[in-house]
Amino acid sequence: MQQNREKFSSKFVTIVVMVGAAVGLGNIWRFPYMMGANGGGTFLLFYVLFTVLIAIPAMTGELTLGRNTRSGSIKAFETAMGSIFGRYIGWILVMCFLISTSAYLVILGNLLSASIIAASSGFDARSIPEYEANFANGWLQYMFAIVVLIGALFVVYLGVVRGIERVSKVIVPLFAMVLVYLVVRTFMLEGATGYMLEFLTPDWSRVNNDLIFAALGQAFFSLGLGGTIMVIYGSYMAKDENIINTAASTALFDSGAALMATLFIVPTVLFFGLNMSQGPTLLFHTMPQAFAALPGGHFIGSVFLIALFLVAFLSTVATVEAGGGSI
């Protein structure tokens, strides 16, 4: 057990870092679509239910494991189980997580490429051909993915306080302000409130196994659970910090970010008569068309895309820290 292990500098910063790790692309390009495909408000209610009853307790367990062992997943599971079998479990979790991260890096590299285009020429329908050309260039994709990885490695190299804390304290509040601004601008559109109320109204006829498992999966996916990130971040928590409060606060802000993204994306897409989609299609095809029709959309779209890249970058930092800190 590492008694001299680095620790987060305050309880508030701990929550900021946790939120930065949890909020990512899944909250922005997956959550709104999942709501739309699964009955809107019905999906939201089940998502909240599973978050409160299952995801928050699971996060509490992961944070507790990390703090009590003062180590990453591999050593933490070995210590908790008291056998080499626990070490194997830790290795499996870390390796699975790192493998899935390789795909996330490519996506984030595409997002970095798109952010550069947006900063120079805006983020609207006119830029779609340029995005597609970049995404079709495999070498360019790998180059940007490597740039993102190097950036994440550098932040981790700086340490918990000088690296992870410092970038989180800048990016998380910035992203929150951008989301608030986008939601306010969206609800200035005529009829946006009506679209949102209709979308949030539960449709109980949509309740089935697919909806239930989708909501359960989103609750776990959204908080970054899986025995890696929250274990390593838990190892940096102070002994006197209330883990339950930290887990609940992280879940609250993470879910709030997902809901605010929905409040921005759904009314905008419906207002302009576009089809809801998910993943890259939503981000690089549907949203540019919406921004093109939105007053001031050239600027608003650029701000949105750059802020999204920055907050998604924090998830990559957390992944690199979880992998490097566990091995």
Where are these regions (language model features)?
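Extracellular loop-to-transmembrane helix junctions
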Residues: E6, M35-G61, I89, A257-M260
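Membrane-interface "cap" regions at the ends of multi-pass membrane proteins
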Residues: M1-W29, I56-L63, R67-T79, I84-Y88, ...
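Hydrophobic core segments of alpha-helical transmembrane domains in multi-pass membrane transport
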Residues: Y47-A55, L93-A119, F144-L158, P173-T186, ...
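Short helix-terminus and kink motifs of transmembrane alpha helices
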Residues: M59-L63, R67, V106-A114, L158, ...
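Central hydrophobic cores of alpha-helical transmembrane segments in multi-pass inner-membrane proteins
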Residues: G26, F46, T51-L63, S73-K75, ...
